[in-house]
Amino acid sequence: MNPMEEVRIFKVTLNIGVGEGGEKLARAERLLEEMSGQKPVRTHSKVTNPEFGIRKKQPIACKVTLRGERAEKVLKMFLEGIGNRLKASQFDEYGNVSMGIDEHIDIPGMKYDPEIGIFGMNLSVTFEKPGHRINRRRIQRRKVPQKHRVSREEAIEFMKEKFQVKIV
């Protein structure tokens, strides 16, 4: 296979949507830091929603972006927690995959801590092929051609080969 056509993981993003700030959000941040080894960043609400008691620009969630070996390690742990099974509908047209878990204690290696509690979380994996830097660089920025973008089928094949995931 052409080395420029090999699919690779660009980033893994872990997200916990708490829905409120304060102590609960701080506990979610501690959990993400414990899982990933990186300090999470807070995300803020975009609009005011009085039904949920949320004001605009209020911190309501936290996320952490992982790259490299750390991303693969966390992805393997997460996949074991959901039983190494994914639905084909979890892959989008650009080959990205998103999954969620209801309780973080289902992930191997994670223990229940009464100070933190139990949180559910979402994980998104972004795939790319070598050469995608042309889309991000500052000088002579270009679009990635359609034939060089990662397709749904390529991402599914990558997950089957590298992580032995079953597609249901």
From Swiss-Prot:
An individual GO BP term: translation
PROSITE patterns linked: RIBOSOMAL_L5
Keyword set, alphabetical order: Ribonucleoprotein, Ribosomal protein, RNA-binding, rRNA-binding, tRNA-binding
GO cellular component, one term: ribonucleoprotein complex
Matching InterPro entries: Ribosomal_uL5, Ribosomal_uL5_arc, Ribosomal_uL5_C, Ribosomal_uL5_CS, Ribosomal_uL5_dom_sf, Ribosomal_uL5_N
Any one GO molecular function term: tRNA binding
Subunit structure, as described in the record: Part of the 50S ribosomal subunit; contacts the 5S rRNA and probably tRNA. Forms a bridge to the 30S subunit in the 70S ribosome.
NCBIfam families: PRK04219.1
Family: Belongs to the universal ribosomal protein uL5 family.
Stated role: This is one of the proteins that bind and probably mediate the attachment of the 5S RNA into the large ribosomal subunit, where it forms part of the central protuberance. In the 70S ribosome it contacts protein S13 of the 30S subunit (bridge B1b), connecting the 2 subunits; this bridge is implicated in subunit movement. May contact the P site tRNA; the 5S rRNA and some of its associated proteins might help stabilize positioning of ribosome-bound tRNAs.
Record protein name field: Large ribosomal subunit protein uL5
